[in-house]
């Protein structure tokens, strides 16, 4: 039997691969993971920059091969994860940057079931995390109210600087009520020990001792944050916050007029501390290696599971769009002309600025206690990006990077280094599962979709769902059995260990009874990130488009109805947004449960 991996002996190549200057369809049929990853890595660049490559992939079976790689399912092997992510990136590039005919071929290649499975998995994981987080929050809340309140003089009554910054950012970025306070031990233990032995020397006739510049800066930042926080407006706290850090030194000999003092452990280099030598490893700042933490937040080293590699996302070398519709790429072209400090994805629709939004969402937002800073809002959320910024992930650019790092106690030099190094995006729900070190939790963590996977799925849907002739593919789809995470979620619920993989049902025997629009509509709820809300709203607005091929009629916006107009303007529009149409009042009332999240007033 002939080997499927083609080789080129005359150029000393063990297998055919795709480069940035050469596309070879045979490279996608390689069964070896490493050369296939190399080819997919270069293909991700070609699909971004070359319209001809995108057109070739639609006629030579390249898209079908990429979809087959995606339908093979995820694996906990790092290389297999990388292969799946790169193949997914290639398909998204083809669909987002391609013309109408190219996008049609992406839908016809059965990409919609893959997207539907990704969205469904993410919703299930989110619901599972929130269902398990609610009892935990209530238990911590009852424990917090039961324990006595410490006095102002105790070190435990003073939250750490990181907790203060996080609390201030949460109050400024969110409008719903904050969750109950949870007692978190302070990070900087050595600072509290020093404060307990501090001696106030402000009344001494000697000149006040000075501290190094970086220490003075740190004290000023701490003072600024505490003065803005109403919890620190008490006289006792104000007096302690206004003292420079030099006052927290042990008593010194009065004959020492030069202000010299013994070097403490906190001012030594990490390599000089005997207790940290075993835990320090060098982290090369390479494009493919995530950087280590800039500043240690706790002396105890915690074990973090291996994160999946992200996608190599390349920006387009050509500024022209392959689609004649300039409206589709106006957002992308505008972002490409801006400086690198601006977000790539410009959200033209601001959901929080809609009137009466808070009153409508109180019933939904108050029920969720898994409150973690939004990755697209909180600038302290780190981003996992290997080499290039994505046209999808707008959170890779931090406009307020210097201000945020200063609030966290980092120096400006450290903040500059952070922007040049690849970081990891801490998803709120992945962090929830990561904190639980059980085997079942790690299985869910490795198989659950990442935020960027969901974001790219929604963006791809936003570009392909505006064609009414393809609407049947979205309303009559199915789930891919090998991509579902039901087994991992069941293991997490039961706390059982991995078992033998059961025989999976054949995908092509499944009925096409899945409508993808109700899944997308769930991402318009406010507990998802702003980018997810934006692209989900775009997809839902595309559902309200009129079909010009059928005489300009529209479909009822309630997904369980699906009735079409018999003539133009037969159905009544929503009075608030003037976009959606319903065949009856009953359909409008039934659809209002989720429609209220993307129903925006028109000027």
Swiss-Prot record:
Chief location bin: cytoplasm
Region ranges (Disordered): 133-239, 269-347, 361-398
PROSITE patterns for the chain: ZF_MYND_1, ZF_MYND_2
Any single Pfam family the record assigns to this protein: zf-MYND
Residues in MYND-type zinc fingers: 558-599
One GO-annotated biological process of the protein: establishment or maintenance of cell polarity
Biased composition range(s): Polar residues: 278-319, 338-347, 382-398
An annotated GO cellular component: MUB1-RAD6-UBR2 ubiquitin ligase complex
Binding residues annotated for Zn(2+), in chain numbering: 574, 577, 595, 599
Function noted in UniProt: Involved in determination of the onset of polarized growth and morphogenesis. Plays a role in the regulation of branching in hyphae and spore formation.
Family recorded in the similarity comment: Belongs to the MUB1/samB family.
Protein name: MYND-type zinc finger protein samB
Record organism: Aspergillus terreus (strain NIH 2624 / FGSC A1156)
Classification of source organism: Eukaryota, Fungi, Dikarya, Ascomycota, Pezizomycotina
């Amino acid at each position: 039997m002939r080997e499927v991996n083609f080789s080129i002996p005359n150029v000393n190549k063990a297998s055919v691969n795709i480069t940035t200057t050469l596309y070879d369809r045979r490279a996608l049929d390689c069964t070896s993971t490493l050369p296939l990853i190399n080819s997919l890595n270069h293909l991700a660049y070609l699909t971004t920059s070359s319209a001809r490559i995108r057109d070739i992939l639609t006629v030579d079976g390249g898209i079908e091969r990429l979809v087959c790689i995606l339908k093979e399912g995820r694996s906990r092997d790092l290389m297999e994860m990388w292969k799946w992510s790169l193949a997914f990136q290639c398909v998204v590039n083809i669909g987002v940057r391609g013309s109408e005919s190219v996008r049609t071929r992406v839908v016809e290649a059965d990409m919609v079931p893959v997207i539907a499975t990704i969205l469904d998995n993410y919703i299930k994981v989110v619901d599972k995390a929130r269902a398990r987080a609610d009892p935990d929050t209530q238990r911590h809340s009852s424990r917090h109210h039961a324990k006595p309140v410490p006095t102002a003089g105790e070190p435990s009554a003073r939250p750490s600087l990181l907790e203060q910054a996080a609390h201030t950012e949460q109050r400024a970025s969110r409008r719903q009520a904050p969750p109950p306070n949870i007692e978190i031990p302070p990070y900087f233990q050595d600072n509290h020990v020093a404060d307990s032995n501090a001696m106030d020397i402000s009344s001494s006739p000697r000149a006040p001792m000075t501290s190094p510049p970086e220490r003075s800066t740190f004290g000023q930042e701490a003072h600024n944050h505490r003065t803005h926080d109403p919890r620190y407006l008490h006289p006792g706290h104000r007096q302690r916050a206004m003292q420079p850090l030099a006052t927290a030194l042990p008593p010194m000999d009065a004959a020492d007029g030069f202000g010299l003092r013994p070097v403490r452990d906190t001012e030594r280099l990490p390599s000089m501390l005997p207790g940290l030598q075993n835990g320090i490893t060098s982290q090369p700042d390479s494009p493919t290696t995530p950087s280590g933490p800039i500043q240690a937040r706790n002396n105890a080293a915690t074990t973090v599971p291996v994160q999946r590699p992200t996608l190599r996302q390349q920006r387009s070398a050509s500024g022209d769009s392959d689609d004649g519709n300039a409206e589709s790429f106006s957002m992308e072209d505008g972002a490409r002309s801006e400086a690198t400090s601006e977000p790539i994805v410009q959200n033209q629709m601001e959901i929080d600025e809609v009137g009466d939004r808070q009153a409508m969402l109180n019933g939904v937002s108050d029920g969720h206690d898994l409150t973690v800073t939004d990755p697209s809002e909180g600038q302290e959320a780190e981003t996992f990006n290997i080499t290039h910024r994505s046209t999808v992930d707008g959170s890779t650019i931090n406009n307020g990077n210097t201000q945020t790092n200063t609030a966290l106690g980092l120096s400006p030099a450290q903040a500059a280094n952070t922007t040049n190094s690849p970081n990891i995006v801490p998803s709120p729900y992945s962090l929830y599962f990561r904190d639980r070190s059980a085997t079942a939790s790690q299985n869910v963590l490795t198989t659950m979709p990442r935020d960027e996977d969901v974001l790219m799925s929604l963006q791809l849907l936003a570009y392909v769902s505006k064609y009414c002739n393809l609407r049947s593919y979205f309303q009559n789809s199915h789930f891919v059995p090998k991509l579902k995470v039901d087994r991992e979620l069941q293991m997490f619920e039961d706390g059982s260990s991995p078992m033998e993989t059961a025989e999976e049902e054949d995908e092509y025997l499944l009925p096409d009874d899945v409508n993808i629009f109700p899944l997308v509509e769930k991402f318009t709820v406010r507990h998802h990130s702003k980018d997810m809300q934006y692209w989900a709203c775009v997809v839902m607005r595309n559902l309200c488009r009129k079909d010009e091929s059928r005489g300009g009629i529209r479909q009822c916006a309630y997904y369980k109805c699906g009735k079409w107009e018999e003539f133009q303007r037969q159905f009544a529009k929503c009075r608030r947004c003037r976009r959606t149409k319903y065949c009856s009042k009953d359909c409008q009332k039934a659809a209002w449960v989720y429609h209220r999240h993307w129903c925006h007033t028109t000027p």
